[in-house]
Regions:
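Conserved SAM-binding loop of SAM-dependent methyltransferases across substrates and taxa
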Residues: 2-16
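A structural alpha-helix within SAM-dependent methyltransferase catalytic domains
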Residues: 7-10, 56, 91-95
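Conserved beta-strand segments of alpha/beta enzyme cores
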Residues: 15, 40-42, 130-132
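S-adenosyl-L-methionine
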Residues: 21-64
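Mobile active-site "lid"/loop adjacent to the S-adenosyl-L-methionine
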Residues: 23-25, 45, 64-93
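Helix-to-beta-strand junctions that scaffold the AdoMet/dcAdoMet cofactor pocket
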Residues: 98-99
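C-terminal catalytic and target-recognition region of SAM-dependent MTase-like enzymes
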Residues: 103-155
């Protein structure tokens, strides 16, 4: 499923940028694009926060932003980070480059970002927009409920 959201956006004729700091994930996503018989996704090997900061300086706006950040990671230049430390900056910059009629979807998988924190940050950065925050659950093969993160959707 790597790059699935990018492929879906491209299949709807959206100009699509796929940003990831992990080259291997970009390679897999590109392969999925080709298997889906799509083309012209812009592949950006960079930290998403740095990309958003640069786009803000350029004055670029986006009709849609889909973020699926890991709970922690190592950036393109080997810098270590944790989502809970970068969440405010990430949401702030995303809010600034999101068109006023655009949408944003953000999944979080860090156990340190609970629903109330995500809602609080959404209020900080999207208070004039309609948004919702929900928990993500799935059924296991044995029928048990498994919590795996939270979702922010800005409309």
């Amino acid at each position: 499923y790597t790059g699935a959201a990018s492929c879906m956006a491209k299949s709807r004729d959206a100009m699509t940028f796929h940003v990831d700091s992990v080259k291997q994930l970009i390679s897999w996503a590109r392969e999925n694009m080709e298997l889906s018989e799509l083309e012209d996704i812009k592949w950006v090997h960079e930290d998403a926060l740095k990309f958003a900061q640069r786009e803000l300086k350029r004055g670029n706006k986006y009709d849609g932003i889909i973020m699926d950040p890991p709970a922690w990671g190592i950036g393109a230049k080997k810098e270590r980070w944790k989502l809970e430390d970068k969440l405010d900056d990430l949401m702030s910059n995303a809010a600034k480059i999101l068109d006023k009629k655009g949408f944003l979807i953000m999944n979080t998988y860090s156990p340190k970002i609970d629903l109330s924190l995500l809602e609080s940050k959404a209020n900080d950065h999207f208070s004039k927009r309609n948004f919702e925050v929900v928990e993500l659950w799935m059924k296991t093969a044995t029928g048990k409920d498994l919590f795996y993160g939270n979702l922010l959707r800005v409309k």
